[in-house]
Amino acid sequence: TAKAIAAFKDKQEYLTDFVRNKKSPRVENPIKIIAIPTTSGTSSELTCWATIWDKEKNNKLSLAHKSLYAEKAIIDPSIMVDKPLGLTISTGLDALSHSMESIWNINANPVSASHAIQASKLVLENLPLLTKDLRNVELRSNIALACVHAGLAFSNTKTAIAHNLSYPVTLNYGIQHGIACSFTLPMITKSMVGIDS
């Protein structure tokens, strides 16, 4: 990803070492990141993670480092209106997965829960409408806001079981990430309702 490249700048061998040997990453003088997302789902513009899909070894790696927080995030829903239906659904479900996993997460706290609940509501209210009106900037704005709330939520908690279960589905069957995450959400949510740690 661009964030990983920015972190390692001219030391790409450190990135290769991280991917191939899972050695702790050495980050020296990273490039400052200005993130302009073109979809609403990953929240990478708000988090300290970079995702690397190693298709050769059939593995997904997450690189976490404070330098991976964007210096600035510019969120402009008007540049998202040309995204196709499948991508819109997948990225929206990724934001929903981030938020719901933050609600039941062992690391949840009042701040993360507040953001997660707001994100979940926004996705559930707006994504079905957006699938019927893809060029609607107001609906895109609401999903972008949901993504911001979800990013702030899971930045505090990290993701949980739905994401962990999704990686083999994406790697082995080519199912888009957000769709793969969403398969297990109903079952996991049902098992979590009423449980309070």
What spans do the regions from the language model cover?
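Glycine/threonine-rich beta-strand-loop-alpha-helix active-site module
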Residues: 1-78
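A general structural signal for well-ordered alpha-helical segments in protein cores
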Residues: 2, 93, 120, 162, ...
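Short, well-ordered alpha-helices that flank and scaffold nucleotide-derived cofactor binding pockets
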Residues: 3, 7-11, 156, 167, ...
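Beta-strand segments within the central parallel beta-sheet cores of soluble alpha/beta enzyme folds
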Residues: 17-20, 141-142, 182-184
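Glycine-rich phosphate/pyrophosphate-binding beta-alpha loops
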Residues: 41, 148-181
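Carboxylate- and glycine-rich phosphate/diphosphate-binding segment that chelates Mg2+/Mn2+
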Residues: 49-157
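Gly/Pro-rich interdomain helix-loop hinge
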Residues: 171-197
